[in-house]
Amino acid sequence: MEASRSIPPQIPGYTLIKRLGSGSEADVYLYQQLSPARQVAIKISKNTLDPRAAVRFRSEANFMGQISTHPYILSVYENGVTVNGRGYTVFEYAPGGNYKTFLEHGRLTADQMLTVGIDLASALFTAHRKGIIHRDIK
């Protein structure tokens, strides 16, 4: 059953600020965490989770937690299921935005592209060492 993307769920301990983006299986929102007080990004599944999907969603958060000590991988703070059955994962908020938005307003220099490529390769290498394969790199 598809959940409405226009109405993000209420999550206890967090106050919605705005929508940050959307992927094929989840939306990402900026929330204010009440304690400790900080802004966080929350990835929320678009659909209610059947038991198999819930296991995958939880596994993804656990894998992210294992590799989040890497400087280019966001920290995971919490993982759960909303009252209406949608999975969510609370991440560190990186306020810089994404590269797609950046590229819509300008170009990267050769040095910047090289730096991004090296940083991305380093993060992927860290994940691969733990047996994690990212299946949605854009």
Language-model segments: what does each one mean?
Residues 21, 59, 68-72, 83:
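Flexible N-lobe loop architecture of eukaryotic-like protein kinase catalytic domains
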Residues 27:
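Conserved N-lobe ATP-binding subsite of Hanks-type protein kinase domains
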Residues 32-39:
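Conserved N-lobe loop of protein kinases adjacent to the ATP-binding glycine-rich P-loop
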Residues 46-67:
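AlphaC helix of the eukaryotic protein kinase fold
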Residues 75-87:
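Short beta-strand micro-motifs within the conserved protein kinase catalytic domain, predominantly
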Residues 84-98, 102:
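Conserved short submotifs of the Hanks-type protein kinase catalytic core
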Residues 116-117:
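Activation segment signature within eukaryotic-like protein kinase domains
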Residues 122-132:
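Protein kinase catalytic-loop region centered on the HRD/HxD motif
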